[in-house]
Curated annotation (Swiss-Prot):
Oligomer and partners: Homodimer. Probably interacts with PlsY.
Keyword Lipid metabolism in record: yes
Organism (species): Acaryochloris marina (strain MBIC 11017)
InterPro entries reported in the protein's UniProt record: FA_synthesis (IPR003664), Phospholipid_synth_PlsX-like (IPR012281)
Protein name listed in UniProt: Phosphate acyltransferase
Keywords, ordered alphabetically: Cytoplasm, Lipid biosynthesis, Lipid metabolism, Phospholipid biosynthesis, Phospholipid metabolism, Transferase
Gene encoding the protein: plsX
Gene Ontology terms for molecular function: phosphate:acyl-[acyl carrier protein] acyltransferase activity
HAMAP family per record: PlsX
GO CC annotations, alphabetized: cytoplasm
Locations listed in the record: Cytoplasm
Pathway annotation from the record: Lipid metabolism; phospholipid metabolism
Amino acid sequence: MGATRARIAIDAMGGDHAPDEIVAGALRAQAELDADVLLVGDPDRLEASIKSHSDSVPVEIIPSEGLIEMNEEPISALRRKRKASINVAMDLVKKKKADAVVSAGHSGAAMAAALLRLGRIPGIDRPAIGGVFPTIIAGKPVLVLDVGANVDCRPAFLDQFATMGTIYSEYVLGTEAPKVGLLNIGEESCKGNEVSVQTYQLLEQNPHVDFIGNAEGRDVLSGQFDVIVCDGFTGNILLKFAEAVGEVALQILREELPRGIHGKVGTGILKPNLRRIKQRMDHAEHGGGLLLGVAGVCIISHGSSQAPSIFNAIRLAKEAADNQVSQRIQSCYQQTVTAASNGE
């Protein structure tokens, strides 16, 4: 995108802590990142929230009406509430008035809005959400997809996830020649159900990925793999479990640190280390999951996201937009689409 500043549309009404925490994260992004944020939502509430921050910076507000509630069926709600914040935000990307969308609201609605308004990239059967996990190697995260968009997957879907994940890992996470694994119950190519066996065969033949074999559950955080593919049912459970393990580990550390005067001294010495541990294990550091396979950049954040997570989600959106992830995926599949249309 050259010297052009990325424009990030924020669904400011979506999320458990909207709009205040969303606004706080957006204001920080406007101040610290080489990007412009567009706050989409109720102008009165957004202006009041902006004024409540002493470090507020000028941001653009895009009016919307209402939001998609968590108990609403996504498709019908999106069609009924055409001026809802997530619809308006997606339309900004569709009309080239923004380069990406960030939403901590109804994840199903965000995915549906992206599909309805932005559309799938030609050649992609199903979009997938990519979740970034820490590994035992500092600075070497692993991308897992899908983590929630598709409960059931065909082998062809998983094969496409591997290609999209490779592009994400290389251009956003900065991984050189990402190594891809298939989440399975054993290392051998014959292990798993029929979908796993067929997917293994497809991945071996995929010229766009460096497939190194099956990844067992114990391998996910080992640093051996850069991209791991699985269906969204398994991936979402893995994501939530990893989040819980991180929280439990931090709580155990707090409980087991020595108490009393000696404990305070020891804790003071260890404080920088504890801060780094928390940073590596905190899912808020990654901001959210990138919806891969749609014709635009869409970051789906955790519903409980607070300002730091929103800031990181905006940072991720900017990196994905600047590095043209969606366009690179489209270019990768253009040859396949052209061949299919020519009957090859």
